[in-house]
A protein has these predicted regions:
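Alpha/beta enzyme core
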Residues: 1-152
């Protein structure tokens, strides 16, 4: 899709055409990428702003987000890197923060492409602790086995 300001009109057209859900993937400005990936859980990041704009215009359309740090990571990894190694548990903590920012913005479905051990339980517990019991977590097994994952 396009910039957040244009997305409501695109979402309206999609909904009129019978599209029930849209998936948002950010194209993060290089200046916002860091080794700590802080932009991933910024409540005013690109996908959160876009989601709020879409939901305000078309509340009935579903919005799906990807939960992964690679778009925000200066090193390009899905995990935080310390001492040349991916640190799983610290990464999972940050993925929970990202999932909460996305759910708070109005995401209905979270696809977890990050592949960190223990992330699903941690994300589910984090979502439920903050009242997001109805936010779905998509298995990437379903996504990989479909035509939906075509661009990659």
């Amino acid at each position: 899709m396009t910039a957040p300001a244009a997305q409501p009109s695109v979402a309206r057209r999609l909904a009129r055409g019978g599209v029930a859900c849209v998936a948002l993937f950010p194209k993060v400005d290089a200046a916002l990428k860091t080794n700590g990936c802080e932009e991933a859980w910024n409540p005013d990041n690109l996908v959160c702003r876009a989601t709020r704009a879409i939901k305000a215009a078309v509340p009935e359309i579903g919005v799906m987000h990807d939960v992964a740090l690679d778009p925000y990571n200066a090193l390009g990894h899905d995990g935080l890197v310390k001492g040349g190694r991916i640190v799983n548990d610290e990464t999972v903590e940050k993925l929970v923060l990202q999932a909460l920012a996305q759910a708070n913005a109005g995401a209905d479905v979270l696809g977890t492409s990050d592949m960190m051990d223990g992330r699903i339980r941690a994300i589910r517990e984090g979502l439920e602790a903050k009242g997001h019991e109805d936010v779905l977590i998509l298995s990437y097994a379903a996504k990989y086995a479909s035509g939906f994952y075509g661009p990659f």
